[in-house]
Amino acid sequence: DVLSNAAAVIAEGEVMQLAAMRNADISEDNYLRIIEAKTAALFAAAAEVGGILAGASETEIEALKSYGKNLGIAFQLVDDALDYGSVNRVLGKNTGEDFREGKVTLPVVLSYRRGDQTGRAFWERAMSAQIDGSNDYEADFEMAVQYLQTTGALQDTVARATHFGERAKDALALFPPSDMRTLLIQLSEFCIA
């Protein structure tokens, strides 16, 4: 039941993401709803199933589900930020993949919302151009990184990831100290490091 519900939510999230494709003018709340329905739902289901299989109480299962949800959001936000940086090569993701595919991520949403008319026009054109191929990808990507840095969008995305990583760790507070709790905390810290 947990996994089938998660699969339905993930499918809904995929549809929401496809509907937001090319549209940098979505709210941060709408973007967070998309990643809650995609990445966070998967992480939450995995953590919930782990609790069920371990025979945890309902309260403990809810705490694990909250841990997974917040960890999933943190993970996705870090992934969003890494798309515009060089560290991601270590993680096996090529820089600019999301940008090349026209995926609107939180850094783009924040930069668009904070940008002036020129910045917003850039994001509208660049996101559409990534889909239809009518662009100079390298020049657009360099400009995108500049806009993200100028508006503080990357730093704020990482700050939000850290916030959700901390919320994930906080969800584990009801569990007594143990090796498993320590490992889950370390996983959250690794995600946002």
Model-derived features: positions:
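All-alpha prenyltransferase/terpene-synthase fold signal
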Residues: 1-193
